[in-house]
Amino acid sequence: MPVALCAMSHSPLMGRNDPEQEVIDAVDAAFDHARRFVADFAPDLIVIFAPDHYNGVFYDLLPPFCIGAAAQSVGDYGTEAGPLDVDRDAAYAVARDVLDSGIDVAFSERMHVDHGFAQALQLLVGSITAVPTVPIFINSVAEPLGPVSRVRLLGEAVGRAAAKLDKRVLFVGSGGLSHDPPVPQFATAPEEVRERLIDGRNPSAAERDAREQRVITAGRDFAAGTAAIQPLNPEWDRHLLDVLASGDLEQIDAWTNDWFVEQAGHSSHEVRTWIAAYAAMSAAGKYRVTSTFYREIHEWIAGFGITTAVAVDE
């Protein structure tokens, strides 16, 4: 059955700290194109790779990868809250195949996800319940992180598993590109913040609002040039886009975790979701990128990209 891909950045600051209208119009046009691409493909199933931002996965038990057979959106930053329409049978089938491939992936019957999943689904298909999904969490913010080669192998294993489902599968990667938002690092965080990173589930409305306001303020400061966070790196972003489009994904195995941070910020690791999605596409054979959008958007603290791709018949 056919497969297709849409990889996209997300930002909780969309609609909260927006750039000038010309940039918004360009982003809106790119998402309009992506939505038409998805609608024309008409997926039976969306396999979505996304990170978490200490809203659903914490240091009390923090796997590098996790497949959800059921998932609940926490509704942060105004995203849709509630259960995703998860295809449980497909999730189990994918998990079994991935484990059989030698990739040690965790599995959850009660996964909690945040805007990394919800915003992508809402932007592409209108709702977290519009199309059955298999949500796959990839740790992208909480050190220690494994080598990116394992992410590529995970994606390939998921792609092989998806090919057996007899469904039209859309692979979605949500995150990145270069960005260094104010996400706390466990090694340097004060004790009270560490406790929240270990088990910060179910914050009060006031606690969540205060946390979100800090990020909004950071976005405003970053756009004004006064934030003490790492700059965006459009050269790095474009290099990543070129490598993913080339289909030669094994070269990514040489990229070190330190290199990601030095070049593109701590949260650049979110491009692991793109790497997994493209690797899943590669399991079906050659692919062709059909559209690419990229802009530096300081107000959203993100090198912001959107790409689509289709399989190429041999």
Curated annotation (Swiss-Prot):
GO molecular function, one term: 3-carboxyethylcatechol 2,3-dioxygenase activity
Metabolic or biological pathway, per its Swiss-Prot or TrEMBL entry: Aromatic compound metabolism; 3-phenylpropanoate degradation
Cofactors named for this entry: Fe(2+)
Disulfide bonds: none
Residues forming the catalytic site: 115, 179
Subunit relationships: Homotetramer.
Protein name: 2,3-dihydroxyphenylpropionate/2,3-dihydroxicinnamic acid 1,2-dioxygenase
Source organism of the structure: Rhodococcus sp
